[in-house]
């Protein structure tokens, strides 16, 4: 693996207007190229806020972010061309078909013509959605919507993919399909930044994880190294529970 950082975060802090404390508190870390980087923590830990800053959805209060060597606040148009974003909230139009939604997102990323049609057909087939391509999204199950949501973020073959809880609320079969194809994307060269509170999934999916709570990163390493460094820990969830002083199912 090429270990040179594709993302560099230095002293990142975010406080929203009228808030009494920071949502993100002095975060510093790097993401290596072709890594699957997991930002893990309970609800309200600061995962989505951090990811939103990295995506350029709003600026930090202080600190800096470099993506592919570019400052996110100065080179946002370039950065938006090389990243894909899969938000936790389903970003699809329920009144359009799956194919129409993907056509819309493809044009937004500058794809058109035969190239766009090919990529839509390719990914619909890969994620077992070809037969549903002309159905309205409003008729889809949660798992199907998650898969279309994923395709919308990867049609343009991004160098970096941001995923916010991509498998939350879906059935096991859909979750396995999504994770399998994300691993294939990573093998093809896409760096993945992924937020989740699902520790078992993250342990099997990520090459590196950082655990965040109350806006601060508590630790970071490969899942195997984190488990080994905490005596008696059987898995990543044990590490998480110790560091955040939580009990099982208290996430």
What are these regions (language model features)?
Residues 95, 136-140:
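Conserved ABC ATPase signature
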Residues 220-221:
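ABC ATPase "signature
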Residues 63-74, 78-79:
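Conserved ABC transporter NBD signature motif
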Residues 103, 107, 114-132:
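Conserved ABC ATPase "signature" region
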Residues 2-6, 13-26, 33, 76:
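A short, flexible loop at the N-terminus of ABC-type nucleotide-binding domains that lies
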Residues 161-165:
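Catalytic Walker B motif of ABC-type/P-loop ATPase nucleotide-binding domains
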């Amino acid at each position: 693996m090429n270990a040179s950082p594709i993302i560099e975060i230095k002293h990142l802090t975010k406080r929203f207007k009228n808030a009494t404390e920071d949502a993100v508190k002095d975060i510093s870390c790097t993401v290596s190229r072709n890594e699957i980087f997991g930002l893990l923590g309970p609800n309200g830990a600061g995962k989505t806020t951090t990811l939103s800053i990295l995506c350029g959805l709003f600026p930090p209060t202080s600190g800096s972010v470099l993506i592919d060597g570019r400052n996110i606040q100065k080179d946002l148009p370039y950065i938006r061309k090389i990243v894909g974003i899969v938000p936790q909230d389903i970003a699809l139009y329920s009144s359009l078909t799956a194919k129409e939604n993907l056509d819309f997102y493809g044009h937004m990323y500058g794809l058109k013509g035969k190239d766009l049609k090919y990529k839509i057909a390719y990914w619909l087939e890969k994620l077992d959605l070809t037969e549903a391509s002309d159905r309205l999204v409003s008729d889809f199950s949660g798992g199907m919507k998650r898969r279309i949501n994923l395709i919308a973020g990867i049609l343009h073959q991004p160098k970096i993919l941001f995923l916010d809880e991509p498998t939350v609320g879906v059935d096991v079969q859909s979750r396995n399909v999504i994770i399998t194809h994300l691993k294939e994307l990573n093998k093809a060269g896409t760096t993945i930044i992924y937020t989740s509170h699902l520790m078992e999934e993250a342990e099997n999916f990520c090459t590196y994880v950082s655990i965040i709570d109350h806006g601060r990163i508590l630790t970071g390493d490969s899942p195997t190294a984190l488990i080994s460094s905490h005596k008696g820990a059987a898995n990543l969830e044990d590490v998480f529970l110790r560091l955040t002083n939580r009990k099982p199912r208290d996430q």
